[in-house]
C-alpha cells in the first residue's frame, strides 16, 4: 500500500500563491534579467509539496517514469517522481562511457536559439512505456520539445509536460505548446519592482 500525497485544489493554489510573493521580491532579479530560483530548488520540504502539486493531474495517466535533463531540474523532477511512485530517468547533455550505448538527438534551445545535444542510454527506458517530462524552468519550450523528441526515438509516449517556472513573453509563441507549469513569470522584469509572478491558470480551476 502506497500513500498518495495529494493536495486539494485550494491548498495547492494557496501554497503556490504564497511562493509567488517570495519570487516577486526585487532582490531576485539578477543581471541579464534572470530570476533567481536556486534556493527553492535546494529546499526539500518546499520541493516535496511542489512535486505533489505537479504530480496531481498525472496520476490518472499512470506514467512509468519521469524524464528530466541534467542538471538544475533534477531535484524538482525527483520529487514529482516520488509523489507518483515512479522511477526518475535523467537525460544527459554529454554522453558518459559508463552508460553504454545511447541515443543522441540535436535540439534548438528556445532561450538562445543554440543547437544543443541530449543523450539517453538505450537501456534506460523501454518501447511502449509512458513518460511524464519535468523541468525546473522554460522560456520558449526548446528543451522540453527536445525531451519529447527523444522519447519518440524510444517509442515512448509522453503523457504530459510539467515545469516549475515558466517565463512568458507577451505574444510570443512557444516552441512546444502543451506545458503545465506552476509559476508564470512575466518577461518584463524590473530590478527595482521585481518580477510579476502568478500561479498558472490551471491551478485556479475549481475541482
Pin down the residues of each PLM region.
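Active-site-facing substrate-recognition patch
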Residues: 2-62
